[in-house]
Amino acid sequence: MINRQLSRLLLCSILGSTTLISGCALVRKDSAPHQQLKPEQIKLADDIHLASSGWPQAQWWKQLNDPQLDALIQRTLSGSHTLAEAKLREEKAQSQADLLDAGSQLQVAALGMLNRQRVSANGFLSPYAMDAPALGMDGPYYTEATVGLFAGLDLDLWGVHRSAVAAAIGAHNAALAETAAVELSLTTGVAQLYYSMQASYQMLDLLEQTRDVIDYAVKAHQSKVAHGLEAQVPFHGARAQILAVDKQIAAVKGQITETRESLRALIGAGASDMPEIKPVALPRVQTGIPATLSYELLARRPDLQAMRWYVQASLDQVDSARALFYPSFDIKAFFGLDAIHLDTLFKKTSRQFNFIPGLKLPLFDGGRLNANLEGTRAASNMMIERYNQSVLNAVRDVAVNGTRLQTLNDEREMQAEHVEATRFTQRAAEAAYQRGLTSRLQATEARLPVLAEEMSLLMLDSRRVIQSIQLMKSLGGGYQAAPVVEKK
């Protein structure tokens, strides 16, 4: 008898195993994931010779030793609505990961139900429609009551939920990196606007000096005309020059106002609480390019880190889609009390226990699972291609910004020599005036070429500062990949 039972059990096991193996839906088509760019492909061209330096440091702006800029950036990071939105996206991604993780855990709920019913005399329970107390039936009306605990657990043997949770955690890590990217964009944006305003202040000072020189020339020519010493042509020429300078002054003042308003919006200041920005000298440009990029660029660019995590999340989603082809197992259980009469509900004899193991085999689904897998794989490959292009774009940013800064540095050296040459001419004119060889007007007007060349030098210095900040941004701005958020 025992041998017969063992034989039956063995036969059932063999049939069950065969069913599990053959009962799964078939994966008709699944391509391999696309390849990601290799680190050795992340390098600059050999003809980019900007001075080598280390990677930018965290809070890079503090190295500029400008308290005004420090205060502006601190206010931006504490009051930016854009940054607040990014942090809310972090919270949303975290809550989504928690939600998916909770769905894979043991679920327990208290259950209470009251069902007042009239049993049909012609239905399956027709005997209970009789009013026969001797037989234990007092129909047709009954009040069924049920109280107890209901529990359910998805065993997730193939990792459907586990991979979905991993994908959600990857999306959360991507959101963390995106927040860092927003911070980098805000800090560099504030610094660029701030130094653009400082350059405008210095340009305004040079234009006002130019106007003073031309104003002196206007008065000198006017005096000569009044005394009949020269024609009116030089006088009107000087007047035209001063009007042109006035036009430039008005334009620069407009630029200062526009830059201030752009800065106000970026730092989140209101109409009456915008801090006063006092003129300061432009900082020295010291940004260079690291000796090598490779893995470091991937780890130091927050946007690339975000893309990398999105790629990983997409691969986890593919794993989840593949796991749907396999059988799923779950267990449900109930323990409580059930009675068709309220007065007997809490008696010992009303106890009820249900243990319900479940198995679901995907046999025929009309191609739904394959379509889902194919679409998920395509989305993952799209993300990989987007990541690859982002890496190439990041290398391009470093190369282009480094080349531009290198060119500006070369132009600045030549322009500085040009300024020095015009200053020599001015000093010669002043010396000639001191010896009585030229007029004071000629000595004063010799200052104009110097001011013009100093303006050109200022424009180059301004562009160099802005470009160095842009290069620093393309190198990650001191960002380093944060510790990975993992499932606890």
Swiss-Prot record:
Gene3D superfamilies: Outer membrane efflux proteins (OEP) (2.20.200.10). Residues 1-23 form the signal peptide. GO terms for molecular function: efflux transmembrane transporter activity. GO terms for biological process: response to antibiotic. It is found in: Cell outer membrane. It holds the Pfam family OEP. A lipid is attached at C24 (N-palmitoyl cysteine). The keyword Translocase does not apply. Keywords: Antibiotic resistance, Cell outer membrane, Lipoprotein, Membrane, Palmitate, Signal, Transmembrane, Transmembrane beta strand. GO terms for cellular component: cell outer membrane. It is a lipid-anchor. A lipid is attached at C24 (S-diacylglycerol cysteine). InterPro entries: OMF, OMP_efflux, RND_efflux_OM_lipoprot_NodT. Its main location: membrane. Could be involved in resistance to puromycin, acriflavine and tetraphenylarsonium chloride. Could be part of a tripartite efflux system composed of MdtN, MdtO and MdtP. PANTHER family: MULTIDRUG RESISTANCE OUTER MEMBRANE PROTEIN MDTP-RELATED, OUTER MEMBRANE CATION EFFLUX PROTEIN. Belongs to the outer membrane factor (OMF) (TC 1.B.17) family. This is Multidrug resistance outer membrane protein MdtP. It comes from Shigella flexneri. The lineage of its organism: Bacteria, Pseudomonadati, Pseudomonadota, Gammaproteobacteria, Enterobacterales. The gene is mdtP.
